[in-house]
């Protein structure tokens, strides 16, 4: 009896692994859930990317519906979606940038040059259009981690009370906006 159970153990382990692998293989990577939908924005106190001395907290964002766009200049998909996001801003959508710095890690002795980043961001936004009311700098990725961000771009639709209503991984284009965001935004306004 013991031998039979020992012989079945590898088969059971194999079957469990197959289920997980198949789920990952056939799952939609755009449907990665953050776990924060229906919850408040995490607490944060982070600097403005472009303005020295200015800091933002989750409380500063209460009272208006907004789209939080996690992005970076290093992200080619972010570059592609900026003109469409700029069009949305022109239609009255409040978009706040969360600049996700991928290349910096103080644990490895990296030195961060805010002025160089500001020049890079300004140049990029001058070419593509600037959809942002303002940009929050998340240098150590603390807010991004609290939100469950896995990369960029990612988007969070947040209501007037600071509750996350919708999360989307990947770029926002007209199709995505109409299918996912526009209906939710209509409900909130």
Regions found by a protein language model. Name each.
Residues 92, 154-189:
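Thiol-/selenol-based redox modules, centered on thioredoxin-like
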């Amino acid at each position: 009896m013991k031998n039979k159970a020992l012989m079945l153990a590898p088969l059971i382990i194999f079957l469990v692994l197959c289920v997980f692998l198949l789920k990952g293989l056939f799952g939609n990577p755009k449907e990665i859930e953050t776990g924060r939908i229906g919850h408040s924005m995490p607490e944060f106190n982070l600097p403005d990317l472009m303005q020295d001395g200015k800091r933002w907290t989750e409380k500063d964002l209460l009272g208006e519906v907004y789209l939080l766009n996690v992005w970076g200049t290093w992200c080619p998909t972010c570059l592609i979606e900026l003109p469409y996001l700029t069009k949305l801003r022109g239609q009255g959508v409040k978009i706040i940038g969360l600049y996700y710095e991928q290349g910096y890690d103080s644990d490895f002795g990296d030195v961060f040059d805010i002025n160089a980043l500001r020049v890079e961001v300004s140049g990029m936004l001058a070419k593509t259009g600037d959809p942002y009311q303002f940009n929050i700098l998340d240098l150590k990725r603390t807010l991004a981690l609290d939100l469950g961000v896995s990369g960029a771009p990612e988007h969070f639709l947040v209501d007037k009370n600071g509750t996350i209503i919708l999360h989307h991984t990947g770029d926002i284009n007209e199709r995505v906006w109409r299918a996912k965001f526009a209906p939710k935004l209509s409900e909130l306004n």
